[in-house]
Amino acid sequence: MAEKGKTNSSYWSTTRNDNSTVNTYIDTPAGKTHIWLLIATTMHTILSFIIMILCIDLIIKQDTCMKTNIMTVSSMNESAKTIKETITELIRQEVISRTINIQSSVQSGIPILLNKQSRDLTQLIEKSCNRQELAQICENTIAIHHADGISPLDPHDFWRCPVGEPLLSNNPNISLLPGPSLLSGSTTISGCVRLPSLSIGDAIYAYSSNLITQGCADIGKSYQVLQLGYISLNSDMYPDLKPVISHTYDINDNRKSCSVIAAGTRGYQLCSLPTVNETTDYSSEGIEDLVFDILDLKGKTKSHRYKNEDITFDHPFSAMYPSVGSGIKIENTLIFLGYGGLTTPLQGDTKCVTNRCANVNQSVCNDALKITWLKKRQVVNVLIRINNYLSDRPKIVVETIPITQNYLGAEGRLLKLGKKIYIYTRSSGWHSHLQIGSLDINNPMTIKWAPHEVLSRPGNQDCNWYNRCPRECISGVYTDAYPLSPDAVNVATTTLYANTSRVNPTIMYSNTSEIINMLRLKNVQLEAAYTTTSCITHFGKGYCFHIVEINQTSLNTLQPMLFKTSIPKICKITS
């Protein structure tokens, strides 16, 4: 037992000794470290477990939140869709409503309002235009004007050079410029269009022609067409006549021998209203009625008719007609050139040439003004003045050009270019040369004729192209000329280049002694009649419009045709 107790005692002793050994180890620094590591590991494990539990809980809550958000977004989408559809429907209804209102306004409301305002404005303008002092304002109510840089050719401005001397050149030969022509024509095969008259103003042009329904007889029933327009530039930068408004006057009025003036934004026309033929008219006392027409760019027209007793004459006339060519405006007066037969001849010596002509003296020249075919009336030119032409009843005053300053009275035209007035008269008598010069309308009235010696016109055998000696005859054809130089020595014209026949229309640039440049329109057999030439400048460059009555041979009728050329002016520098 003692051994046994010893053994146990030894065991416990040993045990105690072991524990003693452990306690001793714990108390050592290494033991304490191990204890703290164990505690830290345990705490880490516990914290990891707690974090894991928290993460799991967070995931569960997040999933629940996402499901909730998805449901919320879906609900919002449904709401947005509903709102969108509501707004779209509101916009659609509003657009439809406004469209209906706009359509109603466009179709009825606005036109009614515009028509009312237009009528009110027209009435206001018309009321104002009845007052003479507001005439200029009224003329500017429509803004239509030639293209920039275009104006009637003024010889004083055109015939000059920055360096050198202005001359007409023969090189290169002139040619026709391309472009449209919108001159009025006839709608009948046997119809005839006669007596073209063109006036180019500062703002617009006026063109008039006579449309005879059957044949070309002067007394035939006819329409008169007055056209207003402006000069534009085509794609080739050449000038064109561009019509804006046209008015056709009643065929029953039978206007004849009309002359035109373009002034401001209106066209003015003076015509004869003959009821008898020319020879019968010259055999009677007093003239046939005249009519003065006014046309504006809105198409409004006004006419004044005058009988012989309504007109103030300086001498009694048996017949008198406007001269076909254009007239001029000076302040409040329009002046047309006219011609006719005096009831009682004037005393004095007319223009005369006696050298190189056998058995010719001044009395032969004086007698040559009295035409047998026209009942021996003395035929003279006159100035037909229309005073206060915008008044309710303009006054017409006729002043005779002294026979001492003129040749045989005939058709012709007036041009006011700058401060100078030019006159052309048809060479209807023995004097076949071109008759163009400057006119002084002051008292006494005088004409300074340019001494042209190469340009002429065809005529009957006794007064043909080459005739130079005074004798009684009435012949020739209207082929006016446009002055390019201030003295009218240099001119542009379209001549019928033949001795006795109205054929071979030829555009010519000439001075008094030499034809410088010319262009035959077709051939020497081409039949033609009246021609008129008017010129303009475009920023200093010169162009001419040539209107020629061409005989449409296959139809045996006349029709004015428009041609254009560039003026062959050069500046010659002499060394």
Curated annotation (Swiss-Prot):
CDD domains: HN
Residues in coiled coil: none
Intracellular or extracellular location(s): Virion membrane; Host cell membrane
Virion surface side: 56-575
GO molecular function: exo-alpha-sialidase activity; host cell surface receptor binding
InterPro entries referenced in this protein's UniProt entry, alphabetically: Hemagglutn-neuramid, Hemagglutn/HN, Sialidase_sf
GO CC annotation terms, alphabetical: host cell plasma membrane; membrane; viral envelope; virion membrane
Keywords, sorted A to Z: Disulfide bond, Glycoprotein, Hemagglutinin, Host cell membrane, Host membrane, Host-virus interaction, Hydrolase, Membrane, Signal-anchor, Transmembrane, Transmembrane helix, Viral attachment to host cell, Viral envelope protein, Virion, Virus entry into host cell
TM ranges: 35-55
A GO BP entry: symbiont entry into host cell
Assembly notes: Homotetramer; composed of disulfide-linked homodimers. Interacts with F protein trimer.
Protein name (Swiss-Prot/TrEMBL): Hemagglutinin-neuraminidase
Organism annotation: Human parainfluenza 1 virus (strain Washington/1957) (HPIV-1)
Lineage of the species this protein comes from: Viruses, Riboviria, Orthornavirae, Negarnaviricota, Haploviricotina
Gene name of the encoded protein: HN
